[in-house]
Amino acid sequence: NSVGTNAEYDGRTSVKAFNDNIGAYSSGILSGWACSPNTGMTVSLGGDGTTRDIAIAEDVSGNKITVNNISEAPISVTMSAAPSTNSRIDLIVAYVDNPPQGSATSIDNPGACGLIAVDGTAAADPVAPNDSAIRTAITADGASGSTAYYVVLATITIASGTTDLT
C-alpha cells in the first residue's frame, strides 16, 4: 500500500495525520490481544484471526507509538514457575527499543518489538510490577529500558504451587 497526501488530512500523509493524533489516546490495548491459558504455565496472546491486535506503547516522556501483531497468529509466552508460598502478579509487556521509522522496503519493521513476561514478587497481598521493574526487565531482555516504549498486554495472577494456568 502506498501512503499518499490527501486533502482530508490537511495536506499531510495519512501516517503523519495518525501520528499527530495518537497523543489523544491513552496507552493500552486498542483492539485484540486477548490472553488465554494454553498448556502448563504458557498463555497465548492475540491472533484470533478476526481482530487485529493493536496497542499503544508509551515512553518515559509520554511519546506514543503503536504495537501490532502483524502475523495475526497467537503468540505463546511461558510464565516463570509458581512461587511455593503466596501468590504473585506477573505482567506480559510488549516493548519497542527504538521506534521504527517508515520504510518502503520493510512492512511494519518486523523484529522491532519484544514481548516478555515480567515477574512480580510473591506476597500475601501481591502487587503488579511497577514501571521501574518493567524497565529493568526490558533492559535484561537486551533493550534500553530507560528509553523504550512499552505497553502492558496482560496481567496474570500466579497462585502458589500452580503448575497449570486456568
Q: Predicted segment positions?
A:
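Glycine-rich, flexible loop motifs
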Residues: 1-88
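Beta-strand-rich solenoidal segments
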Residues: 49-166
